[in-house]
């Protein structure tokens, strides 16, 4: 019997491998290839902190447990290490052997210290002495307390030997004679990592800050010479949960979690050296295994090179600019109240601008007829205009209530700051729910329209974050549908006050009803499926890991239901297995925008339904988070969403298809086929719509009236 489920962690690694695949594409602009390499690194940072740490904890607590994909924690850790070592090796080989030389061809030449000419050596020597040396703090390691190494910060390690052993014995700063003389220097955050060199004839050359510290770091240790050195960083366990049963202040409890994250156990050492003495020293001190150590050649962190985007050369080495079009259904200058009273409006970022969401909140803050604003915030970014609008609304006397989810991983500190700032401005802030993360994205404005109090609702698959809205593909809906508005009211009452679970008529809410609704709709497809008219399920999401849902999809496949899945990241479902999943196809898209929308289509005989959601089909989303799934009821919007969904299954440029052996195979252009790149097709659709609208505007006659 073939495996029924792929392993979650190994499936995630395959997702990062698909990102790396794009970095190898020679047809992509150079800076975009470098960007994909950088994403591989940042993704691994989170993966090791959260997922690898989780498996390591399981190995300690329950070492013999076997997961549904057949792995014990120990065997899984071996597989993780082998796959990650392979990807990281390929990543850095591509960086140093292909991308760095290509940068040099584009007049952005990375230079090692050994390659500097005499003039440049004088420059870097003076630069180090004047601009770098004052920032550096050497940390000795022979004291009883090993120096604290900050999670994900980069360091230089020096293995030292006394120049004069007799003289060193008499020094009050000699340290423990028997201890290895290893010292650390943290690479300062306040300095640019790229140091430009003096050149002639307009040529641009640079060295990296860390290599200056490697070269001149001896100056930090008078009386010693450097035998060996290397650059390194560590990743620590970051998968902490707050004590939600604590009687103390919840913000204080969250701050304790942030402190713990900086001193937890180490799960990875990434370094640039084969210096066995330093590696062995760190291995012992950090209590790690050989499988946890990743040694790379050349530049440790490709992300430092992304600053090259800001150069004149770098600006010409990226994707051609794609405009974010203002939706033609919404007026740029006037408030949206009149439009939304008559129709639902779909917003598709980043092809369409995120400005309407900001304008919607800003208009509500300033409108004298608006009585109240309620919304959820999960990740909203820095310098958010949404926060400014909410504060202004409170200052204008509106009742403003915001649920800020403090437990949004790696955004806890920022969200604590927003919560405090909003409270200081007079906003009522709710800090989420006990033992549940609120991941739903919903905004409701209550306004007095003539003699009627009307509720304007915005629901989204993505966060209220203007910055990521330029990079993540998400769908959202503006509506005044009465059933949805009534459900929105009940939702806010449940998450901000005390309430029994309320039955919702149009919305589905996790952990209450999304899972059961999905299972019911899958079963409905099975019940209505015939040989003449087989059922059809089409779904797009970030990850698919919920075993109950996967089993239901297997059952649907066996009943003849056709299942098309677009899964960007983790997929534990095994497709294409006869007698289990032969009617299931799984594809994944990795392109310039991160695919983030969740779209679920059920054919339902001749009465098809489409839902959008904040939730993926994962246990955490369906059982441990507060999520919302909302129907598309407007016929025009329904048609639009279905056309968007269909495009993702036409892609033959940036798609991979999952096979039953777990391999993701690139979907290639076949002979006679036209090129179909889903994101480009969507961009061109919105551009045509915008261009057509602009032409219509130009043809309209505007009568100039006499000003009295």
Identify the role of each PLM range.
Residues 1-537, 555, 559, 571-708:
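N-terminal localization/anchoring segments of enzymes in phospholipid and broader phosphate metabolism
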Residues 562-566:
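Hydrophobic alpha/beta core scaffold segments
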Residues 547-550, 554:
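Glycine/threonine-rich ATP-lid/beta-loop region of ATP-binding domains
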């Amino acid at each position: 019997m073939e495996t029924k489920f792929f392993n979650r962690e190994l499936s995630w690694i395959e997702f990062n491998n698909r990102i790396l695949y794009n970095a190898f594409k020679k047809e992509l602009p150079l800076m975009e290839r470098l960007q994909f390499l950088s994403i591989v690194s940042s993704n691994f940072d989170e993966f090791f902190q959260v997922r690898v740490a989780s498996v390591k904890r399981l190995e300690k607590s329950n070492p013999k447990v076997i997961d549904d994909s057949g792995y014990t924690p120990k065997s899984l850790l071996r597989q993780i290490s082998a796959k990650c070592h392979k990807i990281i090796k390929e990543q850095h080989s591509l960086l140093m052997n292909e991308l760095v030389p290509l940068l040099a061809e584009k007049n952005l030449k990375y230079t090692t210290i050994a390659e500097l000419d005499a003039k440049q050596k004088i420059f870097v020597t003076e630069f180090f002495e004047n601009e770098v040396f004052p920032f550096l703090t050497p940390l000795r390691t022979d004291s009883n307390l090993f120096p604290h190494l900050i999670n994900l910060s980069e360091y230089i390690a020096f293995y030292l030997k006394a120049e004069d052993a007799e003289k060193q014995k008499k020094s009050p700063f000699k340290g423990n004679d028997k201890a290895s003389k290893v010292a650390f220097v943290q690479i300062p955050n306040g300095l640019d990592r790229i140091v430009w060199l003096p050149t002639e004839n307009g040529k641009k050359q640079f060295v990296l800050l860390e290599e200056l510290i490697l070269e001149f770091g001896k100056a930090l240790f008078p009386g010693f010479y450097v035998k060996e050195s290397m650059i390194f960083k560590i990743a620590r366990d970051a998968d902490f949960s707050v004590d939600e049963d604590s009687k103390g202040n919840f913000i204080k409890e969250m701050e304790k979690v942030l402190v713990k994250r900086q001193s937890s156990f180490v799960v990875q050492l990434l370094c640039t050296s084969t210096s066995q003495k330093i590696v062995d020293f760190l291995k012992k001190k950090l209590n790690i295994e050989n499988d946890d150590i990743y040694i790379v050649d050349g530049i440790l962190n490709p992300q430092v090179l992304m600053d090259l985007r800001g150069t004149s050369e770098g600006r010409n080495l990226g994707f051609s600019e794609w405009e974010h079009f203002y939706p033609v259904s919404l007026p740029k200058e006037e408030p949206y109240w009149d439009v939304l009273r008559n129709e639902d409006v779909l917003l598709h970022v980043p092809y369409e601008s995120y400005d309407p969401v900001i304008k919607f909140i800003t208009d509500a803050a300033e409108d004298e007829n608006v009585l109240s604003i309620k919304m959820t915030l999960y990740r909203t970014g820095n310098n958010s205009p949404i926060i400014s609008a909410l504060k202004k609304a409170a200052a204008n006397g509106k009742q403003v209530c915001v649920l800020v989810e403090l437990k949004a991983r790696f955004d806890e500190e920022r969200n604590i700051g927003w919560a405090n700032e909003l409270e200081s401005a007079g906003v009522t802030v709710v800090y989420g729910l006990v033992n549940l993360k609120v991941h739903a994205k919903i905004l409701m404005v209550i306004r007095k329209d003539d003699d009627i109090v009307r509720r304007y609702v915005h629901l989204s698959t993505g966060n209220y974050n203007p910055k990521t809205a330029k990079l993540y593909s998400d769908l959202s809906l503006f509506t005044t549908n009465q059933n949805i508005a009534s459900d929105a009211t009940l939702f806010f009452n449940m998450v901000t006050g005390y309430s029994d679970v309320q039955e919702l008529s149009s919305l589905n809410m996790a952990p209450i009803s999304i899972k059961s609704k999905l299972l019911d709709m899958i079963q409905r497809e099975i019940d209505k499926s015939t040989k003449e008219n087989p059922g059809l399920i089409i779904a797009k999401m970030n990850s698919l890991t919920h075993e109950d849902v996967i089993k239901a999809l297997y059952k649907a496949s066996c009943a003849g239901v056709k299942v098309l899945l677009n899964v960007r990241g983790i997929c534990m479902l095994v497709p294409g297995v006869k007698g289990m999943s032969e009617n299931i196809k799984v594809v994944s898209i990795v392109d310039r925008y991160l695919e983030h929308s969740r779209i679920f289509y059920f054919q339902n005989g001749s009465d098809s339904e489409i839902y959008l959601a904040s939730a993926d089909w994962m246990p955490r989303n369906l059982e441990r988070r507060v999520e919302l799934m909302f129907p598309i009821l407007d016929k025009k919007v329904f048609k639009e969403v279905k056309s968007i969904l269909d495009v993702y299954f036409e892609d033959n440029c940036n798609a991979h298809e999952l096979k039953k052996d777990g391999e993701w195979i690139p979907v290639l252009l076949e002979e006679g086929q036209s090129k179909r790149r889903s994101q480009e097709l969507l961009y061109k659709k919105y551009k045509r719509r915008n261009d057509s609208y602009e032409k219509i505007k130009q043809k309209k006659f505007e009568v100039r009236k006499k000003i009295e």
